[in-house]
C-alpha cells in the first residue's frame, strides 16, 4: 500500500505533466504574453469560484492574516506567468523550460530562511544536478541572453510563490488559496491590459481557436492543476515540489517534438540530461522517505 507521501508525489507528477502543456499552449495561442495570462487567470478564477460555490461555500471566508499571504502569492504568480509566457514568445519553449531547473537550487537556499530550518546538503546537491541535467539537454541553445534573463526572473518569482504556498497549504483550503491567488493575479494582469490600448484590443478580440485553447489552459492546466499543487503541499515541502517540477521540461520537450517536429531536437545529451534529472528527483524522494521513516520510528 503506497504511503501518503508516495500518493501525493504520484499525484504531483501527473500535475507536472499537465503543467508541461502550458508552454505548448502558450506557443500556439496567438495572444501576446500579458493578455494571455490575464485571460488564463480570470477564467481559472471563475472555474474555481464555481466549484467552491457548489461544493464548499464556506471556503470563501478567509482571515485578514491569510489574505495578506494570498495577495503576495497572487502578485508572485501574476508576474511569474507574465514573464514565463513572454520568455516563451521571445526565446522559445525549450530555453524557457530549461531555466526552470534553477528553481530547486534557489529553493534549497531560500526555504531554510523562510521556514527557519537548517540548509540540507543533499537538497543543494540534487538542485545542482538538476541544473546540470538541463544544461546538457539545451547545451546548444544558451546564446539568447535576453530570453534567459527573463526566464530566470520568472523562475525566481516561481520560487517565492511556492514558498508562500508552503505557508498557506496547512492554513487555508487548497481551492480557496487558488481562488484568491488567481483572483488577485487577474486584477494585476487586467490592470496592465486596461492601460495598454494594443493589449486591450488584442484581449477583447479572440479568435475561435484561442478561445478553445484558453479553455483547456484555464480549466485543466490551471484550475485543476493549481488546486492540486496546493493540496499536495500539505505533505510535500516547497523543495520537493520544485525538484519534481524539473520533470516539466522533460515532458514539455517530448510533447514539443510531437507537436512542433524539427523545432525541438532530441540527441544523446538530451537522454543523459534526463537521466541526471531523474536521478535528482528520485534521490530526493528516497531521502525524504527515509527521513520520514526515521521520524516515525
Question: For the regions a protein language model found, what residue spans apply to each?
Answer:
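Transmembrane alpha-helices of multi-pass small-molecule transport proteins
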Residues: 31-79, 106-107, 157-164, 179-197, ...
Amino acid at each position: 500500500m503506497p504511503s501518503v507521501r508516495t500518493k501525493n508525489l504520484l499525484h504531483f507528477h501527473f500535475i507536472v505533466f499537465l503543467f508541461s502543456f502550458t508552454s505548448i499552449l502558450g506557443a500556439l495561442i496567438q495572444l501576446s504574453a500579458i493578455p494571455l495570462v490575464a485571460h488564463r487567470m480570470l477564467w481559472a478564477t471563475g472555474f474555481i469560484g464555481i466549484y467552491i460555490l457548489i461544493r464548499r461555500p464556506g471556503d470563501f471566508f478567509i482571515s485578514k492574516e491569510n489574505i495578506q499571504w494570498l495577495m503576495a502569492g497572487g502578485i508572485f504568480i501574476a508576474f511569474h506567468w507574465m514573464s514565463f509566457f513572454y520568455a516563451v514568445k521571445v526565446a522559445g519553449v525549450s530555453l524557457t523550460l530549461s531555466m526552470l531547473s534553477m528553481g530547486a537550487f534557489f529553493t534549497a537556499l531560500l526555504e531554510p530562511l523562510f521556514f527557519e530550518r537548517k540548509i540540507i546538503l543533499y537538497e543543494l546537491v540534487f538542485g545542482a544536478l538538476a541544473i546540470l541535467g538541463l544544461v546538457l539537454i539545451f547545451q546548444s541553445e544558451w546564446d539568447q541572453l535576453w530570453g534567459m534573463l527573463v526566464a530566470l526572473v520568472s523562475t525566481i518569482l516561481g520560487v517565492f510563490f511556492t514558498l508562500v504556498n508552503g505557508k498557506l497549504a496547512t492554513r487555508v483550503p487548497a481551492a480557496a488559496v487558488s481562488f484568491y491567488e488567481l483572483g488577485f493575479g487577474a486584477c494585476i494582469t487586467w490592470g496592465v491590459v486596461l492601460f495598454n490600448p494594443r493589449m486591450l484590443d488584442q484581449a477583447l478580440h479572440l479568435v475561435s481557436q484561442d478561445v478553445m485553447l484558453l479553455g483547456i489552459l484555464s480549466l485543466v492546466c490551471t484550475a485543476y492543476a493549481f488546486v492540486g499543487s496546493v493540496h499536495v503541499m500539505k505533505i510535500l515541502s516547497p523543495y520537493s515540489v520544485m525538484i519534481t517540477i524539473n520533470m516539466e521540461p522533460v515532458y514539455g520537450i517530448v510533447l514539443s517534438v510531437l507537436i512542433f517536429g524539427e523545432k525541438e531536437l532530441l540527441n544523446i545529451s538530451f537522454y543523459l540530461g534526463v537521466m541526471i534529472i531523474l536521478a535528482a528527483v528520485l534521490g530526493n524522494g528516497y531521502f525524504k522517505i527515509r527521513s520520514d521513516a526515521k521520524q516515525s520510528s
